[in-house]
Regions:
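Active-site acidic catalytic loop and adjacent metal/ATP-binding pocket
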Residues: 12-17, 23, 49, 136-185
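Alpha-helix C-terminal capping segments
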Residues: 1, 14-19, 38-43, 49, ...
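Helix-rich C-terminal or lid/interface subdomains of diverse kinases
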Residues: 12-13, 178-181, 186-248
Length: 248
């Protein structure tokens, strides 16, 4: 009998694994709608949708392993990281989906969210003021006009699977949509700066490294408090707070 394994669980959604099947439970069916549509449109390998019965989506497990995790050791050869970069470029060059995604928030919305979050981080004593101020300055470089691309929107390292030097699939598409391509590249390399050059080689075009670093700061500032409130530890070695400290 297959065991039921909890992959991730918090108040908004949960993912369970039973054998070779992942069960995604999400009370917000709009997120599942986005995920199913994005997987059908993406020109890269994605999990097979087995069935859907709200609030549950069942997808097949992917072959291979991830390149690592935030705060954990990174695995895979430089060629594997480059292959991931090439897959990301293929996604970004695809025809645009119909709606904006997490990577497509407007500059006005981002500035408002970022300023509010920075104030809360300091007034609630979550992070020291100098750390927040410095990273808010670094984040400014991400707040610029960009050309819309087909973006994943939550392209964490743990969401990309490889077998050897081949990408076997990308999972968790609920934040996909039109957005800033460099947001995806920054999310994928967050906490693993040592592999950024390999990813860019595979991506096949020059990118603005100041904007990548800005997204590292911006994304980390926006998620620290949420992570704490939902039972995760952004203060763990190599995680979001260490990313912020690296910008000092």
């Amino acid at each position: 009998m297959d065991e039921v394994k909890v992959v991730v669980a918090h108040s908004e959604r949960a993912t369970l694994r039973v054998g070779d099947v992942f069960l995604k439970v999400d009370a917000d069916q709009a997120r599942i709608d986005v995920e199913v549509e994005a997987m059908s449109l993406a020109p890269v390998p994605t999990p097979e949708v087995l069935w859907r019965k709200p609030p549950v989506l069942a997808v097949a497990a992917l072959p291979g392993t991830t390149l690592g995790s935030l705060g954990g050791p990174s695995t895979g050869s430089p060629a594997a990281w480059a292959a991931a970069g090439a897959a990301i470029r293929k996604l970004h060059d695809a025809p645009l989906p119909s709606r904006p995604g997490q990577a497509g928030r407007s500059i006005v919305a981002l500035v408002a969210e970022l300023d509010d979050e920075c104030e809360l981080l300091v007034t609630n004593g979550v992070l020291p003021a100098d750390l927040v101020t410095r990273n808010r300055q670094v984040a400014e470089a991400a707040l610029r006009p960009w050309t819309p691309a087909f973006t994943h929107g939550d392209l964490q390292i743990a969401h990309v699977f490889v077998d050897g030097d081949e990408v076997t699939g990308i999972i968790d598409w609920s934040e996909a949509g039109q957005g800033d391509a460099l947001y995806d590249l920054a999310t994928f390399t967050l906490g693993h700066e040592e592999h950024l050059d390999d990813v860019i080689v595979g991506y096949g075009t020059d990118v603005d490294l100041d904007v990548i670093r800005a997204w590292w700061s911006l994304r980390s500032l926006l998620v620290v408090r949420w992570l704490v409130e939902h039972g995760f530890d952004p203060f763990a070695p190599g995680c979001e707070v260490d990313v912020l400290r690296s910008q000092m």
